[in-house]
Structures are given as C-alpha cells and as structure tokens.
C-alpha cells in the first residue's frame, strides 16, 4: 500500500467508511474532479485529511483536481520550504497564486505620503520579487494601509498612486503583478484606505501599468458595496485576481447569501484564465467539513 492509498484508507476509517483500499480510487469521495476555473486552496484548508506537512497538503489538493494554490504567508516561510513547495507545485501542475507582499492594517503608510514609509514599501516589493522567482508566482497582494485623517482623500490618492507607480517600475521588467485588495469597513477592516472596487479601478487606471491590478475579493465587496456582477463587469479590465468567501461567515460557497454559481458562470463566460483564491475558512472544522468544502466547489462550479 503506497502513501496515498494509506492516507485514503485512514480517511475512510476515520469517517466510518468501510471501503477497500483497492476500490477507493473509484469512489466519488476521491475521484479527481475537473474544475472549470482555477480555484486555489491554501495551507491548512485540508490539514485533517492530508496532515500537517505542506507537501502532503499540496499533493492532496492536486489529487482532488485543484490546479492552483495560494499562500498568504509564503514570503515568510523558510527558503528551503519555498523551494520544496515550488518543486512539488511544478510536478503536480499547481499554479502559484498570491502571497502577501505588503500590508499595513494600522498606519496610513502609503496614503500619508511620507518618504520613509514609501521607501519601506518599495523595499518589501523588491524582496517579494525574489520570493516570486523562487515559487514561480506572478501575483502578490498589496494592502496600502489606513486612511490619513489629516489629509483630504484626493491628496491621499495621489500619494498612493505615486508609491504604486514606483513599485510598478520595479515589477514590470520581471512580468510580475501586484494586486490591490479593497477590504470592507463594516465587518473586518474599518479605516483602511482601499475599500471599494471603483476606488481600486480609479487607482489602477491612474498608475497605468500592467504590474498594478485589482484583487477583487468577492466576500469583501459583497459586504462593502454588493452589486457584485455589475461591479466585476465595470472593473473587468483592471482585475487580475479573485478571492472567494461566502457572507456572512467567510466560509466556503453555499454557506451564505452569495450566488457563486452565477458569479463563476459570468467569470468563466468572460474567459478568465487567472486564479480564484479560496481565502475563507471551513464551516466545519473536521475531515467531513473538509470534504464538504470540496463538494461545495464541485457544486458551484457546475455552471456549464
């Protein structure tokens, strides 16, 4: 019995399923699914089924049919682990999604326009280029900080745009893309500068670079502004990446109010070839709950 068969046997036993290892692969619970879009799980999403080892988790994701992966914390992982994860992703056909290049949830770093804060931002962008090279990433996330209550929003926007223009000049020669993530004020992140999709669209147009795009987090934008498909349509030319989570709760699709089947149908119809990050929790914290996440994605992906 090889390692994967043993893992499957252990899972079935823990779920109370009396299934012979020789026939497990033919059962729907382990049948590799062909998804229509590139949904990207993250480390920890399937730890009860796959174990704590990130390599085992990546293998498990690929076994289920996922073709992408995202990891907010990739930049802080040991270089040796980054290299191992990159190798297994290439071997198993997992495309690397975002990691976080820059974030500040407490200070008006980019909006304030202070040179020290801008220099620190650009330093982190340069460091993220090296991470991206190691793990074959194209996209990474930028959260520009909070609003500056001492400046009018127009001045803040100019400050943010200038920082992003300088960052873009670093990224363009490498073909890398920072994706700006608007985050909601009403539930999770009150006071952040970037909060709405039209605002992010305006900033990307002002920066005017292929290396500066929008991370459209469907969970956050449902809370902040709603009107999801029309806003996606308006922002389409500046969207580089999507993230997923249902509302309320920020769990897997089908657990809240968002009609993900229709949203994914629209995204697919527009021939989106990018990644949709599964940046949400699981509604149930056990093996059965992790299987439920997989089944939820099969359900909302059935739009063809």
Positions of PLM-derived features:
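Histidine-acidic metal/acid-base catalytic patches
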Residues: 2-62, 136, 194-216, 220-304
């Amino acid at each position: 019995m090889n390692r994967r068969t043993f893992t499957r046997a252990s899972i079935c036993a823990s779920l109370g399923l009396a299934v012979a290892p020789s026939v497990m692969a033919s059962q729907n619970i382990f049948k590799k699914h062909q998804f229509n879009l590139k949904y990207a799980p993250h480390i920890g999403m399937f730890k009860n089924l796959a174990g704590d080892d990130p390599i085992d988790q990546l293998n498990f994701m690929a076994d289920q049919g996922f073709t992408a992966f995202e990891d907010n914390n990739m930049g802080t992982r040991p270089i040796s682990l980054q290299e191992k994860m990159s190798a297994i992703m290439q071997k198993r056909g997992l495309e690397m999604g975002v990691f976080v290049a820059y974030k500040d949830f407490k200070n008006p770093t980019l909006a304030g326009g202070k040179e020290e804060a801008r220099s620190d931002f650009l330093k982190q962008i340069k460091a993220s280029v090296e991470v991206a090279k190691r793990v074959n990433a194209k996209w990474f996330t930028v959260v520009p900080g909070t609003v500056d209550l001492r400046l009018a929003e127009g001045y803040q926007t100019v400050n943010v745009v200038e920082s992003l223009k300088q960052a873009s000049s670093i990224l363009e020669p490498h073909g890398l893309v920072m994706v700006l993530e608007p985050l909601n004020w009403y539930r999770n992140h009150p006071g952040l500068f970037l909060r709405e999709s039209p605002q992010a669209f305006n900033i990307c147009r002002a920066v005017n670079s292929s290396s500066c795009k929008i991370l459209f987090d469907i969970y956050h934008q449902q809370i902040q502004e709603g009107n999801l498909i029309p806003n996606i349509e308006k922002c389409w030319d500046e969207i580089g990446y999507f993230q997923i989570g249902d509302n309320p709760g920020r769990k897997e699709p089908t657990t809240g109010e968002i009609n993900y089947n229709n949203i994914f149908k629209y995204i697919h119809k527009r021939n989106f070839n990018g990644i949709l990050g599964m940046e949400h929790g699981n509604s149930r914290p056990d093996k059965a709950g992790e299987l439920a996440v997989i089944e939820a994605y099969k359900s909302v992906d059935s739009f063809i």
